[in-house]
UniProtKB/Swiss-Prot annotation:
Domain of life, per lineage: Bacteria
This protein's name: Methionine--tRNA ligase
Record's subunit section: Homodimer.
Chain's gene name: metG
GO molecular function, one term: tRNA binding
Physiological role: Is required not only for elongation of protein synthesis but also for the initiation of all mRNA translation through initiator tRNA(fMet) aminoacylation.
Source organism: Vibrio vulnificus (strain YJ016)
């Protein structure tokens, strides 16, 4: 067995998944990446390598701040609840993280500040005043993701303000065509603000060398070359208050842009792990001259940040760069984008309520490769492939032989192994399967394994132990045939252990033997196994249908909760909250104001005045002329004969159109939304308002 791990030096690896954003649930799109990374990590551990597998919630930014407000809680409360939910989902899919943390942590604050200050010290940070989009209704600067419009590069509509999902380009939100605030829908206005920039162009030579190292995926390297040719730009790393995140050291009301401290979250999570253990050294893994290996698994939508900004930030602040960034595509369901209305936008928790997580792990593995290809979760194919491969070909191999071993031979395998050539063929496949796992060609590895399963079942079919069992004097032959079948099953499950850890654990209990990569070199002989129990259940199409219906219900409940929160927030935004009560005054101050009932004798528009109406008011034996800016709210003729309230002792004011001898009282924010005060029936002109 040439690829025996005992023949190679032990590797030390730090592996990460992209940090899920802490404002929503994990769904099957997220799970592609986490399953892909977990399979690779489990394979490395199976080969005897030391792996630290870490992740965290990406917990900063305006979206989190606004959603927390919508939910009526603090951002800290919301991200704490989301973290619990995320970790439960990942555990449900057997994602074997060594540590799961949050970017909103002391470790991350310290590391983000340290990296920023080092970059500043080394001359890679500058500041300048920029014109930035500002929401005039919400009175806030708009983060990139809260401006939507048409991409300036490819002209795709409904794109975010920082990068285009259609063409992958990044740009400034001010470059968007027809921008709109995603918060209020208002057209943003430009407003000046001082911002801080990371000088990415200074790292172009280093990044080109890193790209040419040959370790990056071809598609990633080609995309980076396009970015080099179009020219690297300085990167805006700051955001203005209000913002949920870390304040920039030494600056007031300036915060780190979420994409600065998010990847530093990899370091923060590992630092948190190091602080909890005494066998890990943070510097050993992150020093510039580190001999350990660092790998990031990410989706294709965040390549720009991980292949340009992140290695440049690390290099500029004295840390090591990643060995590689493994990029995957998106998940579609039944050939289309995941849809909430169709029930194909499936949350991880909803899946776990209806189906075995190992089914999805196997199916994703069977379709994954090392390229940046989208993966389609075809639910019909999903059912057929899992049932055919896992149940019919692999698990059935054990059930076809285990019964005879248990009933006829007290659970003991044969002392002699009678098919060494066949077994050696299975063992020889280990090197090829190992290469495919290492290269993340999981689909090809699965095809190698299922091809071996076909050979194992062919052997059992040809030997027909159910026929031999009925023949006199054939007990030894029966035991030997079934022992071969059990041993071939053992090899197959060893190869599948990174993909299906729970099934592998049940197999180990059945075989009474740990499955190890080097262990397959020799078959089990004269070995006692336990009584066979069902190891794996078929997928029932009814469960998939139930999952789809539950996903539709999830979407409806989510929409109802959102509408309820919005209604609650709208109710909370009272007139009083929008226009707070003025400072207290003494009673004597109020007593100076003489309010009287007035009858509107006449009312007419003022020529060449957009807002004014001219009133003649009877205030009880005395006529007053008053001008009032309520023209947008009333037709003059509709007011004649009505009673209202007027400030009678207001000093007369000379206006362009005449003398105004008082003030009519009206309520409202202005414009069309104004209502004059009217007394109840019985009030007479000249009466004092007490």
């Amino acid at each position: 067995m040439a690829n025996d791990p005992r023949n190679f030096p032990q590797r030390k690896l730090l592996v990460t998944c992209a940090l899920p954003y802490a404002n929503g649930s994990i769904h099957l799109g997220h799970m592609l990446e986490h399953i892909q990374a977990d399979i690779w990590v489990r394979y490395q551990r199976l080969r005897g390598n030391i792996v630290n597998f870490i992740c965290a919630d990406d917990a900063h930014g305006t979206p989190i701040m606004l959603k927390a407000q919508q939910m009526g809680m603090s951002p800290e409360e919301m991200i704490a609840a989301v973290s619990i939910e995320h970790q439960k989902d990942f555990a449900g899919f057997d994602i074997s993280f060594d540590n799961y943390h949050s970017t909103h942590s002391d470790e991350n604050r310290e590391l983000a500040s340290h990296i920023y200050l080092q970059l500043k010290k080394n001359g890679f940070i500058s500041s300048r005043t920029i014109s930035q989009l500002f929401d005039p209704e919400k009175e806030m600067f708009l983060p990139d993701r809260f401006v939507k419009g048409t991409c300036p590069k490819c002209k795709s509509e409904d794109q975010y303000g920082d990068n285009c999902d259609a063409c992958g380009e990044t740009y400034s939100p001010t470059e968007l065509i027809n921008p709109k605030s995603a918060v209020s829908g208002a057209t943003p206005v430009m407003k000046d603000s001082e911002h801080f920039f990371f000088d990415l162009p200074q790292f172009e030579s280093m990044l080109k060398e890193w790209t040419r190292s040959g370790s990056l995926q071809t598609e990633t390297a080609n995309k980076m070359q396009e970015w080099f040719e179009s020219g690297l730009q300085q990167w805006d790393i700051s955001r203005d208050a209000p913002y949920f995140g870390f304040e920039i050291p030494g600056e007031k009301d300036k915060f780190f842009y979420v994409w600065l401290d998010a990847p530093i979250g990899y370091m923060g999570s590992f630092k948190n792990l190091c602080d909890k253990r005494d066998d890990l050294d943070f510097d050993e893994y992150w020093n510039k001259d580190s001999k350990t290996e660092l790998y990031h698994f990410i989706g294709k939508d965040i390549v720009y940040f991980h292949s340009l900004f992140w290695p440049a930030m690390l290099d500029g602040s004295g840390f090591r760069k990643p060995n590689n960034v493994f990029v995957h595509g998106y998940v579609t369901v039944n050939g289309a984008k995941m849809s909430k209305s169709k029930g194909t936008f499936v949350k991880a928790s909803t899946y776990l309520e209806h189906l075995d997580p190992e089914c999805l792990r196997y199916y994703y593995a069977a379709k994954l490769n090392s390229r940046i290809d989208d993966l389609d979760l075809n639910l019909e194919d999903f059912t057929q492939r899992v049932n055919a491969d896992v149940v019919n070909k692999i698990v059935n191999l054990a059930s076809r032989n285990a019964g005879f071993i248990a009933k006829r031979f007290e659970g003991k395998l044969a002392e002699n192994f009678v098919e060494p050539e066949l077994y050696n063929e299975f063992v020889a496949a280990a090197d090829r399967i190992a290469e495919l796992y290492e290269a993340r060609e999981f689909g090809r590895a699965i095809r190698e394994i299922t091809a071996l399963a076909d050979k194992a079942n062919q052997y059992v079919d040809e030997k027909a132990p159910w026929v031999v069992a009925k023949q006199e004097g054939k007990d030894q032959e029966l035991q030997e045939i079934c022992s071969v079948g059990i041993n071939l099953f053992r090899v197959l499950m060893t190869y599948l252990k990174p993909v299906m850890p729970a099934l592998a654990a049940r197999t180990e209990a059945f075989l009474n033997e740990e499955l190890t990569w080097e262990g397959v070199a020799q078959p089990l002989t004269a070995h006692e196994i336990t009584a066979f129990k069902a190891l794996f259940n078929r997928i029932d199409p009814k469960n998939i249908e139930a999952m789809i219906e539950a996903s539709k219900e999830d979407a409806a409940a989510e929409m109802a909760a959102k509408e309820k929160a919005e209604a609650s927030n709208a109710a909370q935004e009272t007139e009083l909250s929008k226009d707070p009560i003025a400072e207290e005054i003494e009673f004597d101050d109020f007593a100076k104001v003489d309010l009287r009932i007035a009858k509107i004798v006449s009312c007419e528009s003022v020529p060449k005045a957009d807002k004014l109406l001219k009133f003649q008011l009877d205030i009880g034996g005395e006529m007053r002329q008053v001008f009032s800016g309520i023209k947008a709210a009333y037709n003059p003729e509709d007011l004649v004969g009505k009673y209202t309230v007027v400030v009678a002792n207001l000093k007369p004011r000379k206006m362009k159109f005449g003398m105004s001898e008082g003030m009519i009282l009206a309520a409202g924010p202005g414009g069309k939304d104004l209502w004059i005060l009217e007394p109840h029936e019985g009030a007479q002109p000249g009466m004092r308002v007490m």
